[in-house]
C-alpha cells in the first residue's frame, strides 16, 4: 500500500470515529434531556411541584401547589386529595439551599387540615430568603389561611374564598377546663401567625373567627375575593399573570 493511500485510509477512519463519537454524545444529551423531562413530569404528578424557567429572563422559579387537605401524622384516605408535609418540608429546605432558585410561587386550593402540619409549612415558607408570592384559587380555608399569608405578597382570584373558624378536634374530647385552655392555645398560635404576616389586627381576626351570624352550624366567617383584601388578610385581587409579575418584581429588587 502506498503511503498516500494509507494516510487517506487512516484519515477516513479518524473521521468515522469522530462522527460516531459526536453521534454518541448527541444521543447521550437527548437521553439526559428526556430523563430530566420525565423526572419533572413525575414530580408534578406526584407532588404538584414544578420548575418554571422558560421565561424571557431565564429566571428559575419553583412552583408549589397546596391542594386538598393538609395531611397530619396519620395518612388520609387514598381517595382524598392531600398535601403531605413530609414531602413539602424537605423540598423547601432544598430550595433554600439551592442558589439557582430565585423565587417561589405558591398556588392554594385547600380545605384546611392538620394545624401543626399547616403551621410547619407556613413557618418554613415565611423563613425562606428568596422572594415568595401566593395565589389563592378556589379557596384557602381554616389552616389554609396562614399558608396564604405566609409569603412576601399574596393574591386571591375574584371568586376565591377563605373561611376563618375556631379550631376543631376529632376523636375523644375530655370535658374539662384544661381542654378549653388547650384549644385557646392552639387558636392563639394561628391568630398570632396570621396577624404577624397580614395587615389584619389580632382582635379583628378573632372576631371573624368567633362570628355567630354567618354560618348556620358553626362559628366563623367566609370571605370572598375583595373582602379578604378589605379585611387585610390578602394583599391584592388578581390571577396568575399578576402573581408572576409581582414575583418577577420582587426577584429583580432582591438581585439589585
Regions found by a protein language model. Name each.
Residues 1-135, 139-145, 150-165, 169-256:
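N-terminal organellar transit peptides
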